Amino acid sequence: MQIFVKTLTGKTITLEVESSDTIENVKQKIQDKEGIPPDQQRLIFAGKQLEDGRTLADYNIQKESTLHLVLRLRGGVIEPSLQVLARKYNCDKVVCRKCYARLHPRAVNCRKKKCGHSNHWRPKKKLK
């Protein structure tokens, strides 16, 4: 039977499948056509995310049904060289205790008028 897979970009992929095919098999066919690894794919049908071990018949997916393909979000790990850069620009500062303005490390008074150019400041907390 033929089913359709619609991506977030609006592209529609046509797949030839059997109702006994598992979701893993469908993801493999999508990889063969589009080059998207199965571990990055999430398939949605009737508002439900489809689980790898189940079959198309388990979800009552019939001929000419449309599945929606969304990509799995990636983790937010910062590359080590970018961490060093972030520390250089963000952590060598002092913070006003009254208005929380970030100030230059050698600042004597705050630059903001709302705290009365206070001289009460603390070092900015370091990134972990």
UniProtKB/Swiss-Prot annotation:
PROSITE patterns: UBIQUITIN_1 (PS00299), UBIQUITIN_2 (PS50053). It comes from the Eukaryota. Keywords: Cytoplasm, Isopeptide bond, Nucleus, Ribonucleoprotein, Ribosomal protein, Ubl conjugation. Residues 1-76 form the Ubiquitin-like domain. GO terms for cellular component: cytoplasm; nucleus; ribonucleoprotein complex; ribosome. There is a cross-link at residue 48 (Glycyl lysine isopeptide (Lys-Gly) (interchain with G-Cter in ubiquitin)). GO terms for biological process: translation. There is a cross-link at residue 76 (Glycyl lysine isopeptide (Gly-Lys) (interchain with K-? in acceptor proteins)). One of its GO terms (molecular function) is structural constituent of ribosome. InterPro entries: Ribosomal_eL40_dom, Ribosomal_eL40_sf, Ubiquitin-like_dom, Ubiquitin-like_domsf, Ubiquitin_CS, Ubiquitin_dom, Ubiquitin_ubiquitin-like. Ubiquitin is encoded by 4 different genes. Uba52 and Rps27a genes code for a single copy of ubiquitin fused to the ribosomal proteins eL40 and eS31, respectively. UBB and UBC genes code for a polyubiquitin precursor with exact head to tail repeats, the number of repeats differ between species and strains. In the N-terminal section; belongs to the ubiquitin family. This is Ubiquitin-ribosomal protein eL40 fusion protein. It comes from Acanthamoeba castellanii.
